[in-house]
Amino acid sequence: MARYLGPKLKLSRREGTDLFLKSGVRAIDSKCKLETAPGQHGARKTRLSEYGVQLREKQKVRRTYGVLEKQFRNYYKDAARTKGNTGENLLTLLETRLDNVVYRMGFGATRAEARQLVSHKSIMVNGSVVNIPSFKVSANDVISIREKSKKQARIIAALEVASQREKPTWVEVDNTKMEGAFKRLPERSDLSAEINEQLIVELYSK
C-alpha cells in the first residue's frame, strides 16, 4: 500500500479528530469541520457497527503515526508477544519510532516532516546517522541534528513552533545544540486520552 499523499485535513475529518498532520501550534483552524466527514455526503450521520467503531479507531491511530497497514499489523503482533497490556505495548512501540521521537522533540513540525528529515540523513542517534524512520529508539538515546543540517529553515521554524507548546515529559531537548535525550519510555498516562487502544486489540483479536 502506497503512503497517502492527499489533503491532510481530509484524514482528520474522516476520523473526526485532529490527527496533528498539519504544522503549527494549533494544527487545524475553526473553519475545518472535524465533526463532518469529507465528501458530498459527509454531513450524513451514519451509525457505525461495533466493527466499524474498532476499524475507525485503528485507522485514526495508524494515520496519526503515519504507519502503513502492514507495518501497523506487525507492531500489533510484536505488542501481543510482549509481556503486559497489548494496547499499551502497541502505543509504546509507535512512540519509540525515530520519526515520532524527532517530532516529539520538536525538530519536525509534523511526523511526516520528521520522517523526511530522517530519510534525508539529517538525524543522528548517539552520534551516528540513522536514515530509517522506523528505527526503534531506546531509553537514554541521544537524538541530534546533523551539523550540516542545522541551518535548515524548516528545522528552525519547527523548533520555534515547538517552543510554544508543552514538551513531552519523557524527552529533554536543548534547542541551542539541536539535540535531545529520550529519557524514558512514555507511560499510558503521558499519551492522548482520545486514543482507545482497547478497540484496536478487540479488532485484531477477532
From Swiss-Prot:
* Keyword match Ribonucleoprotein: yes
Ordered alphabetically, the record's keywords are: Ribonucleoprotein, Ribosomal protein, RNA-binding, rRNA-binding
The superkingdom of the source organism is Bacteria
Q: Show the Gene3D superfamilies listed in the entry.
A: Ribosomal Protein S4 Delta 41, Chain A, domain 1, RNA-binding S4 domain
> What molecular function does GO assign, one term?
rRNA binding
Instruction: List, for all copies, the residue spans of the domain called S4 RNA-binding.
Output: 96-156
Instruction: Return the InterPro entries for the record.
Output: Ribosomal_uS4, Ribosomal_uS4_bac-type, Ribosomal_uS4_CS, Ribosomal_uS4_N, S4_RNA-bd, S4_RNA-bd_sf
One cellular component term (GO) for this entry is:
small ribosomal subunit
Give GO terms for biological process. ribosomal small subunit biogenesis; translation
HAMAP family with a match to the protein in the record: Ribosomal_uS4_B (MF_01306_B)
Subunit and partners: Part of the 30S ribosomal subunit. Contacts protein S5. The interaction surface between S4 and S5 is involved in control of translational fidelity.
Describe the task this protein carries out.
Answer: One of the primary rRNA binding proteins, it binds directly to 16S rRNA where it nucleates assembly of the body of the 30S subunit.
Q: Which NCBIfam families match?
A: PRK05327.1, rpsD_bact
By what name is this protein known? Small ribosomal subunit protein uS4
Species whose genome carries this gene? Shewanella sediminis (strain HAW-EB3)
Q: What is the lineage of its organism?
A: Bacteria, Pseudomonadati, Pseudomonadota, Gammaproteobacteria, Alteromonadales
